[in-house]
Design a protein with these regions (language model features):
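Local sequence-structure signature of Cys/Sec-based thiol-disulfide redox active-site neighborhoods
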Residues: 35-41
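Sec/Tat signal peptide C-region and signal peptidase I cleavage site
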Residues: 19-25
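An amphipathic alpha-helix signature
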Residues: 92-96, 100, 117, 121-124
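Short, cysteine/histidine-rich loop/knuckle motifs that typically chelate Zn2+
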Residues: 45
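Positively charged n-region of N-terminal signal peptides that target proteins for export
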Residues: 1-5
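A structural feature that tracks compact, well-ordered secondary-structure segments
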Residues: 84-88, 97-98, 109-111
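Flexible coil segments in periplasmic/lumen-exposed cytochrome c-class electron-transfer proteins
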Residues: 27-29, 40, 48-78, 109-166
Length: 166
């Protein structure tokens, strides 16, 4: 009885462990794969104005057109780029090189850089399939430079004091 239960538990764990990879790998068309990666990667959270406020129900026609709401921190003020305009001006190779490069906060560039070339190509093809639309995001503002757009202050508050040795 215990061996049967252990075997069933192991089989279930293996099936569940492979579930997300199977689901992701089952998307063979590069454009559909790119759509999937954009959605689960959270690209729209910042790069689509109003996406969070609509709980992800923004029309796909509006996806990845950037935002005029900035993120301000010690690095200055950055704005989510209009990826549809940006990628319309990049070759696939230029996109992959850019995706592997360090970017200003709060862009989680290290997550993008960890993606496979095939995933980055799929994202590129998806964004290009949407076509260029919208206007460029506002320009970067250096630390201390005044901005006249809305922005989030990205500085943690109420952090505990640093402990020696950590």
């Amino acid at each position: 009885m215990n061996q049967t239960l252990a075997a069933a538990t192991l089989a279930a764990a293996l099936a569940l462990g492979n579930g997300p990879a199977w689901a992701a790998d089952s998307v063979q068309d590069p454009i559909e794969r790119g759509r999937y990666l954009v959605r689960i990667g959270g690209c729209n959270d910042c790069h689509t104005a109003g996406y969070l406020e609509t709980a992800g129900r923004s029309p796909e026609a509006d996806w990845l057109t950037g935002s005029a709401v900035g993120f301000q921190g010690p690095w200055g003020t950055t704005y989510p780029a209009n990826l549809r305009i940006a990628l319309a001006n990049y070759s696939e190779a230029q996109w992959i090189a850019r995706a592997r490069s360090e970017m200003r906060p709060p862009m989680p560039w290290f997550n993008l850089a960890a993606m496979t070339d095939d995933d980055l190509k799929a994202m590129y093809r998806y964004v290009r399939s949407l076509g260029a639309r919208g206007t460029p995001a506002p320009d970067y503002a250096a630390p201390g430079q005044a901005v006249n757009t809305p922005y989030f202050v990205f500085v943690p508050q109420n952090l505990p004091p640093k402990t020696a040795g950590r």
